């Protein structure tokens, strides 16, 4: 146990280590990209604004600022719904600093389709909490972003999803493992409804909880896959970074 603790401590100190695994896969004729991250080996963070207080808006501006700071972008994805000024719609924490409060009430659109949830990155766990559970448990999150709806909650699909829904878009989201050590970021590369998208997490990845990030504007960056999606400006960004050698 002592050796394991020392090993994990050393891993955390080393920002050059990454277990990030990105790949292409298929679920029921739907092509999707998945990036799997590991809490103790991947430097996973949330980003919103640059050092001048301006929203990054895209992966290129984030890459440039990271490069100027001696860091490299390995993976990135839009991470939660946002307003026209690119500010988060819901709860947002960056480097332990709360930028936006939790929104627990129902509302319009996918965000307000309760239950919605919060993706939390802490020092010893990565987890998706249903919003009311989050308020009850008050976990200590270094980073957090609220979005909605929950795709999968306690291994069950959101009750309002319809299998035959014709509302089909490119979509993206995140799921977390039962041991709270792994996060799975998924972007569908074909249009699909929320029911099918949620089943990628439930039936293919077998995760107990998954959260919808967005549709229409879904984007992913992967150095490993040489994938860099462009398009409309985005708000919060989740990313894996490492220090340059």
Model-predicted segments: where are they?
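Conserved, well-ordered active-site substructure
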Residues: 89-105, 160-172, 176-178, 182-209, ...
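Zymogen propeptides
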Residues: 17-110
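Active-site-adjacent helix-turn-beta-strand microarchitecture at beta-sheet edges
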Residues: 87-161
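Short, solvent-exposed aromatic-acidic interface loops
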Residues: 49-54, 133-137, 187-191
């Amino acid at each position: 146990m002592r050796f394991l603790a020392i090993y994990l401590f050393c891993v955390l100190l080393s920002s050059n280590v990454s277990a990030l695994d990105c790949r292409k896969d298929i679920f029921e004729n739907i092509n999707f990209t998945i990036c799997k991250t590991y809490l103790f080996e991947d430097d996973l963070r949330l980003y919103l604004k640059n050092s001048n207080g301006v929203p990054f808006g895209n992966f290129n501006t984030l890459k440039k600022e990271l490069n100027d700071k001696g860091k490299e972008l390995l993976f990135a994805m839009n991470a939660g719904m946002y307003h026209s000024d690119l500010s988060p719609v819901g709860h947002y924490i960056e480097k332990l600093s709360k930028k936006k409060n939790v929104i627990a009430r129902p509302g319009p659109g996918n965000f307000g389709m309760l239950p919605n949830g919060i993706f939390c990155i802490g020092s010893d766990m990565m987890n998706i909490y249903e919003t009311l559970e989050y308020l009850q448990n008050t976990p200590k999150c270094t980073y957090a972003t609220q979005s909605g709806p929950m795709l999968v909650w306690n291994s069950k699909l959101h009750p309002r999803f319809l299998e035959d829904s014709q509302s089909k878009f490119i979509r993206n989201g995140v799921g977390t493992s039962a041991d709270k050590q792994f996060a799975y970021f998924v972007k569908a590369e074909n249009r699909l409804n929320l029911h099918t998208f949620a089943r990628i997490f439930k039936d293919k990845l077998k995760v107990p909880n998954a959260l919808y990030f967005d549709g229409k504007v879904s984007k992913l960056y992967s150095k490993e896959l040489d994938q860099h999606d462009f398009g409309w400006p985005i708000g919060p960004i989740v990313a894996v970074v490492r220090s340059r050698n």
